[in-house]
Swiss-Prot record:
Compositional bias ranges of the Basic and acidic residues kind: 471-488
Domain of life: Bacteria
Region (Disordered): 461-504, 617-636, 677-696, 932-952
GO CC terms in record: plasma membrane
Organism ancestry: Bacteria, Bacillati, Bacillota, Bacilli, Bacillales
Keywords, alphabetical: Cell membrane, Membrane, Plasmid, Transmembrane, Transmembrane helix
Compartments reported by the entry: Cell membrane
Protein name: Uncharacterized protein pXO2-14/BXB0013/GBAA_pXO2_0013
Topology with respect to the bilayer: Multi-pass membrane protein
Matches recorded under NCBIfam families: conj_pls20_p028 (NF045890)
Ranges of biased composition (kind: Polar residues): 617-628, 677-688
Transmembrane regions: 17-37, 86-106, 117-137, 150-170, 314-334, 336-356, 371-391, 396-416
Amino acid sequence: MATMKIKEWFFQSKKALVIGILAVITLFVSFTFTPIAYAFDWYEFLGLKDVDTEKVVAFLQNEWIQYADFLGSIWQSIQGGIIKTLLYIVSALEGLIPDTFSFFDILKDAGLNDFASSIIKGLFYALFVLVIVWLGIRTIIQHKPPRFKSVGVNILVMIGLLGGLNELMADMQKMSTDFFSETTNTSKAKDGLAWDLVKQNTADLIYLSKTGFEPIQSKKENEPAISSTDSKPKNGMSKDIFLKAQLGDVVTPKVIEMLTSQKDIPKETEYLVYKITNDGDKETVEKINDSVFNPFKDKFPGGYVRYPMNFGTIFWGLLALGVAYLFTVFVFVMTIFEIAMKKIIAPIVFVTDIETGEKTKMVIQDIFKGFLVFAFTGLNLRVYTIIVNYLAEKDINAFLYIVAMVCLTVALINGSESILKYFGVDVGLKEGKNHLTGMVGGAMAAKGAIKGAGRMFSGAKNLMSGGSGQTREDTPKRSEMDSNHESAESQGEQKNTAKGGGMQAKKFARNTGAAMSYAANRGVGGMMNDAGNKVAETVGGAVDKGKEKVSGVAKGVSDSVKGTVSEFKGGQAEGKQKAQENADRQTLNTIGKGIQNNANAGIEPSASPKIANRPNVASISNERQQGNIKGERQTAEREIELQNKLRNTGKEEGKQGNVKSERQTAEREIELQNKLRNTGSTEGQQGNVKGERQTAEREIEIQNKLRNTGGTEASQGNMKSGSQTVQREVNVLDTLRSTGGTGTINSDAKAGVATIQRDVNVQNNIRGSEAVDSNVRAGSTTVQRDVNVQNNVRGSEAVESNVRAGSTTVQRDVNVQNNVRGSEAVESAVRAGSTTVQRDVNVQNNVRGSEAVESSVRAGSTTVQRDVNVQNNVRGSEAVNHTVRAGATTVQRDVNVQNNVRGSSEVTADVRVGTTTVQRDVNVQDNVKEVRKSRLRPRGSTQNRTDQLRRR
């Protein structure tokens, strides 16, 4: 029983028991073996008892001593393969340059020399005689004859050059080629500049372990030696040995042990069996074979890279040299051909230039410079290699090294400015670059031409073989190959026909027609204007590249021809329409610029601006008994800020009405963009003006103070509209006496800054039994007006007028009905501020017939549409029509007034006012029995009361 309990406890406490046992063992080991390990001589254990660790660490920290394991050996092999490839290519290009010198043999060619000799023999005497004759003529004719002394000297020089030109050119050739060879090949490395660059930046540890490590060791403290220019090289390899060597080889400890067994081996060779590690607080070394961090040491033992190299220096240097050699080949070949041409041209120049000798000197200089190109190009390449090796010796910043290499490469391609300045020889390789790019472009063009010819041949072969030209896309799927196979084939044929030449011809015809019509309608100036403003779109189209597949069906060809004609006509119509649109746009831009300039200069435009004849502009016609004006929808965008203060006063007087206005002030800043389109037509006996809804965006702040008094108004119509930004001050003074006449309104408009002042005083004097006076006052931001006018004159008619205004909407209907058999007088004065549109409408009708007058004006939120139509029937059947149109930024209003006299009529007017919307309905009916001419003096005269007040 006890045994079972012990076993049960053991299994339940198994985890805790194991942890306790491990803790006890750890404590025992730490207290027992730690002092022993601390007192242990690790240097003796690692075999470093007799080794100067500091010297070994300093030697192994050299940049040329690079430790590599299995992966490091692979990376070194990749770098070596890249360097070998570049060296092989650059060496091949470098070997082409001496081969280009073989083209100098053309100067010794028998054919070229025979050709030059034949030219000299055939032309020498003839040209020489002609030159002598010409000199004689010039001596006789010219005021200053040629200098015969210089002519004689030039003849002697000519004879010497003709006889010794070949020998002179041969000597120049030999000197230039020898100079190039001596500058590009040093006394130590005869394999060229490319191999010299690689040799100076590559080391061989096996070679250095025999000869000494001085070439890679620092000569000064804290100055690592990357390259050495001493007599001892870093390696003893030639170019062939380097190309065959395994650049990923690693020097293992076994190899070092074999080397150290030999005599006269440097002591530093023994250090290569160690690698750098640390003992916890400082760097130390350990033997490579004893390293526990190399799991592949049995199969791939670690060691030091045998062929360490400056990969970046060699890579960029070989790349720059390869580009330079490639361009140099083109430069040398072109220079040799130019020298050969100068050899042919030189004798002709010598004979014809015996007067001054300037051209002879020029030819000799050009030949001399041509040969100097070879010599100085070699010098330029050699200096480049020396500077690259110098940069490799210095321990400089990586960024500065890259900048220096880029500058050196650019200088190598552009050439030395010093050589160009002092010798006049351009040793740059820009011409070679241009020739190379031209050759590449020509090769690409030839390749494209070959492909195009192949496509043409393939298409012609398909056409001649009677093939339908069906493509993979046109082939029906297997699931679609059912009973409708025949219809599918017919659809495929139609598709192929459309994709063939028919569609191409139609497209070409359409584009051609559009281009011709556009050019004919716009002209050269219009086309240039469209191109400058980027308005016109590209009309012409190039014929698409590709295959032209024609099915050969006669019906398809016929349809294609017909379609081509129709497409050409359609293109003409499109071109004409496009030209008209561009012309209209140009006209609108011109008008807009003129209005803007006038507004900036403070010039007020005329009251009746001219509008271009457009099919969308309204036209109003008159008839004797019928008149109706309808306005189509107008849209605009406005941003308005308003502050209005209005105060109106009115009083009731006797039979004669007198209207006096007090000044009203307001400040407005308006920016308008309006697009107006109005149409008008005439209808029955009564005129009705209806405005459709107008939309806009406004931001308005209004402060209004209104006080209105009702009275009588006379009938006289006059409307004046200005631009959007108009400043007017209008003074109207009408005087009507009781002798039975009708007063005239005199209005004067002046522009202010941003203020609107309006005084409206209405008094009604009626011989009937009723008179209505209504005062409407509005607060700062809300306008509410109720106007009720009832007049009973000689009959049973009643007139009602209700004016109601909301907070943000203004609607005004004014209905005035006057039956007057006496004389009335009406005075109205309206003054406007600087940027506000001021409108004066004065209507006077003296009618003895049965006419009726009705006028309705409604305006939307941001767009005002007003049609003004005045018809007067006076003692007969005459009709008067008055239309006022505004400019580009001006509000247009149409007012229709008809007078009905001696009858019974009823007038109803609703006026509603809001802050941001103005809607006005005006209906005026007057029954007048007497007609008199206006006695108001014309504006501008000395008797005019308004002008007199203004002068004061």
